[in-house]
Amino acid sequence: RRREEAGNIERRIAVVNPEAVGRGAQFLVGIEVEREQRDLVEKLRRWIRSEPSIQQAYYVTGSADYVLVITATDIAAFDRLMSELMAANPNVRRFTTNVVMSSVKRGLYVPVD
């Protein structure tokens, strides 16, 4: 309770097994944007935040500008989502996809001293 009041705990959640709820297809997607123009980047971020299939999203360094963790019912659903991404965000230059073969560790636990 004290950690919640201090703002250390953002929210309480349940970690759901994606396979158990029919979302067993999981993907790690790297997105590269054309330009770091503020309004275009914010449009992409709004789209990412509004899409329920995107579980996590990170602005990163390296070859990609963003890395997304995505769940889907199958490859076809993922393909539709990526088509929507490209249509809604012309500033996206390209994306790369890693298909998750199996989950080694899943959670949002942060060690606290």
Model-flagged regions — what are they?
Residues 1-113:
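A compositional/biophysical signature of low hydrophobicity enriched in polar/charged and small residues
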